[in-house]
Amino acid sequence: MVEVLANPSRLPLPWVRVQSRMPAGLGFSPMSMREINGGLYHRSFFFLAPRTRLTRRHQVRCLRRGDYRLTTVALTAGELLGLSALDETLDCDAHLLVYPRLMDPEEIPLPCQSFLGDVLVRRFINPDPCLVNGARPYQPGDPPRMLHYAASLRTGQWQVKTCDASADPKMLVLLNVARSARQWADLGEQDTQVIEDALSLAATVCLLAIDRGAAAGLAANTTLTDEGEEALLLPDRSTEQKDALLSLCARMTLKMHRTFPAFLAQLTLPPGVEDVLILTCYEDEAITAQAERFREQGARVVCHLLEGGESHG
């Protein structure tokens, strides 16, 4: 953080205090911090000689992922004896996004590694339903969405579409920010860390997929810090998608917006998504039913239970 103060007058300013409220997720030198009414405030003191300009730099440690904004700064200046002082509040617009910690590939759990590996393999061999090149007779197990009705009418028997191989696989990671099916209150510190680790896992898997040519997206049953916007990023494999993904992760509140089964029920899979990774601390019949709905739409669904997770039916 950089503070710049100037004194253009011919008279000195014996002392100037700059004070601003800081989020707990940002760390400064303990000597410059003070707790007031439960909030942390960063304070700096200056002596400004006549017609001088001072620049002071502070090292900031990003302790937690988040979306941090500094909107006002309180400025106080006084004379040498401290008998009088002038106060002024200045508006500012400082904005800092702290991204989640990314895992090393070796830290990714085996089920998620296998899921990612299958997505990348099918990048070269997976049929793309948008690239129809003909038809063949129906076989047991063919999904209903692949029926070729025009060819079936011509031949008098059921036909299914045949497709060229796809070079653009799409995957979607779905994160459950609730620790249990009965949770309604905010997460405790220990539970919050479990979900933070899950968010790091989700971001790492998506970025690895994008780096290797696949399209990846992320959604969660929570909202973002600004205006309660739902946490949803549709799959893409562009370079800009990586920045958008990290920004989304930084802005997530981890406060449950709706139950995970309700979130899944209202979710419509984006066109072309054939791989879905669910990250959740628990799995019950309601979640299983929604996962089965995605499978009926032709998607491969993998449900990974997070640390200490439980399966109930």
Predicted regions and their residues:
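Von Willebrand factor type A / integrin I
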Residues: A24-G25, L224-E229, T239, D243-G313
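A charged helix-plus-loop insertion that forms the helical arch/lid used to bind
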Residues: D236
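An amphipathic, basic-hydrophobic helix/alpha-beta surface used to engage anionic
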Residues: M1-G228
